[in-house]
Every structure is written in structure tokens, then in C-alpha cells.
């Protein structure tokens, strides 16, 4: 099967509602011609919401890049139906802020620790917080206040988040900072991220540390 899903969440990450047409149904998963639902990937959880008022339980991408929506009541759909899509915008927007916030944190760590002096070994996010797992020899608590202060300063200044494609690779860049390959959804300006409310450092063994970030 070729890729048949138009990914509206890449064209406009701020779309909250859209229409789509059912192309195929497999068990409890439906394939649409276009979608605003972001599928799980790149450390970012899938969107929540409804299709024709039916709850969406999971969203995933297959090997061809088609986006499948696992729904609570698949029997309410048939191939050819035109359907109404609505995402849980509060949930998505929190994830957008956290995802862009992690990219900004990466730049701040490069400034504070020195680019090339630390290594990102893992990451993740939920609607509550973002996480980076880092290989670095010194205890990051030493730099915590500096990291928070610089992060919040950049947020106050603001700056455009640029997104573009090169072939099938998607790239993001905050201001004139690092270019980061990324398939996630992001805010348009880093002012939208908000300040860091809490930054927690913990050891995860063998010279690796975890930074967890909560936003205001």
C-alpha cells in the first residue's frame, strides 16, 4: 500500500478540527485520506480526540507512512464516509510546548555545558513534563539555576521556530540555533513555551543523568 494519508498536522499544527474520508477499516483501526491526529513517534505521544464523536484510543503510523486511528466503536464507520475530526487541543498544545521546550533545552545545555561536552542518550515527554537523559561527568545540579535562568531568558525574548523539509527529512530550528531533525509538532514562537517551573536532576547510573522539566 502506498502512503495515502495527507498529514494536516504538518501543514498546520494549530488545526483543531478537520474533515476526512474513510479509505479503509482494519479491525478497530480506520485509515483516512487526511488527518489532524499526530501518531505516536519521535518520543511524542499520539493525539487524543474524536472522529464523528467516537473516542480515538490510539494513533499509529504504518511502514508506508499511513496514519491509522484506533477507535472505540469501529462499527460506526464504513469506507467512503466523510467524518469530522476533533483533537483534544489542550492536550496537543501542552505537548507542542514541551516538545519545543526540549529543543530549547538542548541549545541551553550546549551553551552552559559546551557543545560536544555532553551527549543526549535518551528523551521522552508526556503532557506533564519533558525528559532528557544525558551523559556528562559532573553533577548537573551544579548548573541547574544557570540552565533555568538562560532558558527563561530566551522564552521572554521569543523567537521563531522554523520547520522545513529536505526530501523526506524534516528539520526544525529555533532562531539561529542548532538545526535538529524532528518529526514532531511545535509551537510557532518560543514565547509560547512558557517558563520552566521545575527542573529535576537524578542519576540513572554509569555516568548518565536524567533531567526532567516541568513548564509553568
Swiss-Prot record:
GO terms for biological process: alanyl-tRNA aminoacylation. The keyword Metal-binding applies. GO terms for molecular function: alanine-tRNA ligase activity; aminoacyl-tRNA deacylase activity; ATP binding; metal ion binding; nucleic acid binding. Keywords: Cytoplasm, Metal-binding, Zinc. One of its GO terms (cellular component) is cytoplasm. The keyword Cytoplasm applies. Gene3D superfamilies: 2.40.30.130, Threonyl-trna Synthetase, Chain A, domain 2. Zn(2+) binds at residues 99, 103, 182. InterPro entries: Ala-tRNA-synth_IIc_core, Ala-tRNA-synth_IIc_N, Alanyl-tRNA_Editing_Enzymes, Thr/Ala-tRNA-synth_IIc_edit, Transl_B-barrel_sf, tRNA_SAD. Binds 1 zinc ion per subunit. SMART domains: tRNA_SAD (SM00863). Its main location: cytoplasm. It is found in: Cytoplasm. Its cofactor is Zn(2+). Functions in trans to edit the amino acid moiety from mischarged charged Gly-tRNA(Ala) and Ser-tRNA(Ala). Belongs to the class-II aminoacyl-tRNA synthetase family. Editing domain AlaX-M subfamily. Monomer. This is Alanyl-tRNA editing protein AlaX-M. The gene is alaXM.
Amino acid at each position: 500500500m502506498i502512503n495515502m494519508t495527507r498529514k494536516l498536522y504538518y501543514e498546520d499544527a494549530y488545526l483543531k478540527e478537520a474533515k476526512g474520508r474513510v479509505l479503509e477499516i482494519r479491525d478497530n483501526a480506520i485509515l483516512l485520506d487526511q488527518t489532524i491526529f499526530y501518531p505516536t513517534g519521535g518520543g511524542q505521544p499520539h493525539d487524543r480526540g474524536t472522529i464523528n464523536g467516537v473516542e480515538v484510543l490510539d494513533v499509529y503510523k504504518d511502514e508506508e507512512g499511513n496514519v491509522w486511528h484506533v477507535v472505540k466503536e469501529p462499527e460506526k464507520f464504513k469506507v467512503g464516509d466523510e467524518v469530522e475530526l476533533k483533537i483534544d487541543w489542550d492536550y496537543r498544545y501542552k505537548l507542542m510546548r514541551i516538545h519545543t521546550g526540549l529543543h530549547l533545552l538542548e541549545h541551553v545545555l550546549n551553551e552552559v555545558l559546551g557543545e560536544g561536552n555532553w551527549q543526549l542518550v535518551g528523551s521522552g515527554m508526556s503532557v506533564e513534563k519533558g525528559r532528557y537523559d544525558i551523559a556528562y561527568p559532573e553533577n548537573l545540579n551544579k548548573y541547574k539555576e544557570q540552565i533555568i535562568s538562560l532558558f527563561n531568558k530566551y522564552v521572554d525574548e521569543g523567537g521563531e521556530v522554523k520547520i522545513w523539509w529536505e526530501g523526506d527529512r524534516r528539520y526544525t530550528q529555533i532562531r539561529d540555533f542548532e538545526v535538529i531533525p524532528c518529526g514532531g509538532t511545535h509551537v510557532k514562537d518560543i514565547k509560547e513555551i512558557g517558563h520552566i517551573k521545575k527542573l529535576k536532576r537524578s542519576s540513572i547510573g554509569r555516568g548518565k543523568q536524567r533531567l526532567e522539566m516541568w513548564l509553568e
